[in-house]
Amino acid sequence: MLDKSEAIIEAIDAREILDSRGRPTVEAEVRLESGAVGLAQVPSGASTGSFEAHELRDGDKARYGGNGVLKAVRNAKEKIAPELIGKDALDQTTVDYAMIARDGSDNKSNLGANAILAVSLAAAKAAAAELALPLYRYLGGPLANVLPVPLMNVINGGAHAANNVDFQEFMIVPVGASSFKEALRWGAEVFTALSKVLDSKGLLTGVGDEGGFAPNLGSNEEALEILVDSIKAAGYEPGTQVALALDIAASEFYADGQYTYDGTAHSPAEFIDYLTAMVEKYPIVSIEDGLHEDDWDSWTILTARIGHRVQLVGDDLFVTNKVRLQQGIEKKAGNAVLIKLNQIGTLTETLETIDLATRNGYQSVISHRSGETEDTTIADLAVATRAGQIKTGSLCRSERVAKYNRLLRIEDELGDRAVYAPKVGLGPQF
């Protein structure tokens, strides 16, 4: 039997590092008395929901334009560390709720969600190291064997790119693959074909924050047409083999009760009609943030209209928060929740939200942020929770590919036990 004293937290360190956009973020290191160590880095978003946990920045314009995180680093070292040293890293719930209590706010604004999450994840990794288990197995147990279907963001728009495309993400989804390895290959081949299609049209092939191409296009629908052409050019069947998904990020272009896209303002009813028409015209299996984060009535209408035929994901709507998700469940708003660790700020609360979703028939989509690091926790989390879906960007930029490569390693480790999510009814099943 494990000697619990060997999992006692002995020291916590933290530092300011850079994310994939060159902005500071927090890295934390948790060391146990046994010598086991966990290291974690936290991401940062560009398009953020109003109800997210607070990311603490320094505000000192003389350093990183005010985006430094030295305050959060200090909080981890001077306020969180004394609270956790001596506690059992194997008791994740106690570790996380001790930090929540020490912070004392509703949104982690005192210590900073970036400080709290970094320590939360580092503690979990230290505990996994103590037991000599991979993180996915430590978190998920023996049933952690489902590899997620990737929703690959190959055309970037909105807040993720400096172009004229309103919608934030246009994704390909290899639903017909037989394994994660095959799904990744299909995605990479479509991505290469997309590059050639864009080049043939004289469009730029520079990439946005998440590694997708960021061309200036005539309309949002043109992006969908180009993706369908690219899937065919790669030798795959649109819909049955490689489907499409969208992150509308509608809160970004909503004001005064209207949605403004393609240069024209539309009422919520008109926008719902537009989304319905797109689902009928294109092989779309998932739409994220199709409406504003507080437009609950429209969300209910949209879900009743097309929720039986397409996955409707709440990101800004739910912000990985079980209270917001419970509201959505009661209002029948959406049928899936995007899971971003830094929206809520601890591993425990993230797992609680996933559990609530599962118990109420909502799908969970594990997600990165636009400002990422080399940390691959979300890959392990997707497998641990049997979520069946992951969003971690395009097929380029090493901070994105790191997560895909981690999933390849997990699939290899699992061997014959590995199952690709669509094969067991997980992922967007439409």
UniProtKB/Swiss-Prot annotation:
Its cofactor is Mg(2+). It comes from the Bacteria. It catalyses: (2R)-2-phosphoglycerate = phosphoenolpyruvate + H2O. Keywords: Cytoplasm, Glycolysis, Lyase, Magnesium, Metal-binding, Secreted. Pathway: Carbohydrate degradation; glycolysis; pyruvate from D-glyceraldehyde 3-phosphate: step 4/5. GO terms for cellular component: cell surface; extracellular region; phosphopyruvate hydratase complex. Binds a second Mg(2+) ion via substrate during catalysis. Its EC number is 4.2.1.11. GO terms for molecular function: magnesium ion binding; phosphopyruvate hydratase activity. (2R)-2-phosphoglycerate binds at Q168, K340, R369, S370, K391. One of its GO terms (biological process) is glycolytic process. SUPFAM superfamilies: Enolase C-terminal domain-like, Enolase N-terminal domain-like. Transmembrane segments: none annotated. The active site is at E210, K340. Its main location: cytoplasm. It is found in: Cytoplasm; Secreted; Cell surface. Mg(2+) binds at D247, E288, D315. Gene3D superfamilies: Enolase-like C-terminal domain (3.20.20.120), Enolase-like, N-terminal domain (3.30.390.10). Belongs to the enolase family. Catalyzes the reversible conversion of 2-phosphoglycerate (2-PG) into phosphoenolpyruvate (PEP). It is essential for the degradation of carbohydrates via glycolysis. PANTHER family: ENOLASE. This is Enolase. It comes from Picosynechococcus sp. (strain ATCC 27264 / PCC 7002 / PR-6). The gene is eno.
